Amino acid sequence: MNILKLTPSCKDYLWGGSRLRSDFGIKSDLNPLAEAWVLSCHPDGPSYLADGTTLADYVTAHPGCLGTDCEKFEQFPILTKFIDAKNNLSIQVHPSNEYALKNEHQYGKTEMWYVLDCEPGAFLYYGFDHEISKAEFEERIKNNTLTEVLNAVPVHKGDCFFIPAGTLHAICKGIVIAEVQQNSNVTYRVYDYGRVGADGKPRALHVEKALDVTLRTPPVKHDFGSHLAQGCLLYTSPSPRDSTSSR
């Protein structure tokens, strides 16, 4: 099989910067250049072959190109993108497969981040710093105090984070990330710093759905690998099944 060179679909979300173009060679006239979907069969941002064929159409026409391990999936299973966060992304959550298939007619979204680069002092939000009730979660969204109870995690170049569906999170300013995720584009935004979109209106929030799917038990921090130069740090979120009773 020949190697296929893909052209990404790019996004100009308002929090983006220019480093994907200047530092990573992504060709796009968009400004800002927030994301490049470099391996994607999703209709919201497909990757393209040199002849203009989408990767999704190519995979459909050549079902054996992915080998036998992917045959059990109904669609191309992953989406890979580069993200340049010049400013904070919204605080958001992605639903599980079960919830998304029922309510959005597509799969949910679990994702993984690899930090390609970051500014000194950069951090991201990952879950809550203590368990909170659904009522408190909703109230803090309403009064703009949600960040007071979030887990702020310092990041460094080379760090890797696993973000299970249901984990409230946000990539914050000064971070460039490579993301591998499920082939989904379902995001429930709960806080956006009062920003407005290109139409001059506040960007939509999705509070009710976020209340349904967010895990409100804090992630567990694991330190290990002390014999390594920088050690290892792992955060794990409780499973949705374990947290159902406390939502």
What is each model feature region?
Residues 1-132, 192-231:
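Transition-metal
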